[in-house]
């Protein structure tokens, strides 16, 4: 989402995954909600916020710097932190579409960024091909069809897309069940279950690589930090100063329907077992490709 919010790739913003290790806090932090990844507790440090470390200029500010006559607005779920002065709360697709419709009826030129956390949430819990997912997609398609009809003649360019795809998981393996890999690490892994950053002991690099590839050779693609950066999977541009901190010396990215669950005993005790049926951040086509749908409603 940060690429949408900033107009820049992860390599430049430093926002590369859900949970990143911050040496400033000495722990893995879920960056969007700003909570401890293990306990789920919010950060309570006044003198050092996430935005102080990996802050960025929102696209709204960038637009207003070029043309302050525009009306710049975001439509977001109620739990999302505001990033611009004019923010409309919408917790459903209906509310989001209604907000777009109302704003587009005004005479003032505007830029509107709207986001809904479904179908992502539904797919996580029921899978890509569940009845719940199919029903939501059909209802959403109907709602957008109605929106397009209502926006005709308003000189609106409507773009519909997503921040990632999804892939159903058929095999889950907990880090707790991988002692041969755990013993090679200096600290808990981070980032995502399908894009994992490993900080490996210098004297255990060969053992780690052998252990990982013997178990996951056809399931994850293993990169060194240098190989990942050279691949430009994080995009092109000036490297953020924290990238070197956030990436371990090995990174594994899923290429199959196997997912390694990043958990420790405390996290499992607090949150229970991971129940996601579908997830993302791997290199499968389903996860990498997103649609871009455009309506030019003059």
What are these regions (language model features)?
Residues 1-298:
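Feature captures the catalytic ectodomains and active-site-proximal regions of enzymes
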């Amino acid at each position: 989402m940060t690429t949408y919010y900033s107009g820049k790739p992860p390599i430049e913003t430093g926002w590369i995954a859900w949970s990143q290790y911050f040496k400033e806090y000495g722990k893995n932090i879920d960056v969007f909600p700003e909570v401890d990844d293990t306990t789920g507790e919010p950060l309570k440090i006044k003198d050092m916020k996430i935005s102080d470390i990996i802050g960025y200029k929102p696209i709204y500010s960038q637009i207003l710097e070029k043309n302050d006559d525009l009306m710049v607005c975001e439509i977001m779920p109620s739990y999302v932190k505001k990033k611009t002065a004019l923010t409309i709360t919408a917790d459903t697709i209906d509310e989001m579409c209604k907000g777009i419709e109302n704003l587009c009826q005004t005479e003032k030129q505007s830029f509107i960024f709207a986001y809904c956390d479904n179908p992502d949430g539904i797919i996580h819990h029921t899978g890509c091909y569940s009845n719940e997912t199919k029903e939501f997609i059909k209802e959403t398609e109907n709602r957008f069809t109605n929106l397009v009809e209502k926006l005709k003649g308003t000189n609106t360019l409507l773009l519909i897309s997503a921040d990632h795809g999804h892939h159903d998981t058929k095999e889950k393996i907990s880090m707790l069940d991988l002692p041969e890999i755990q013993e090679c690490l200096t600290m808990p892994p981070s980032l995502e279950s399908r894009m994992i950053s490993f900080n490996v002991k210098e004297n255990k690099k060969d053992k780690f690589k052998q252990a990982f590839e013997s178990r996951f050779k056809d399931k994850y693609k293993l990169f060194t930090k240098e190989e990942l950066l050279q691949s430009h999977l994080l995009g092109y541009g000036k490297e953020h100063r924290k990238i070197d901190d956030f990436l371990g010396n090995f990174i594994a990215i899923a290429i199959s329907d196997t997912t390694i669950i990043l958990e420790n005993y405390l996290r499992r005790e607090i949150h229970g077992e991971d129940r996601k049926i579908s997830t993302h951040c791997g290199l499968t086509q389903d996860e990498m490709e997103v649609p871009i749908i455009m309506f030019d409603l003059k």
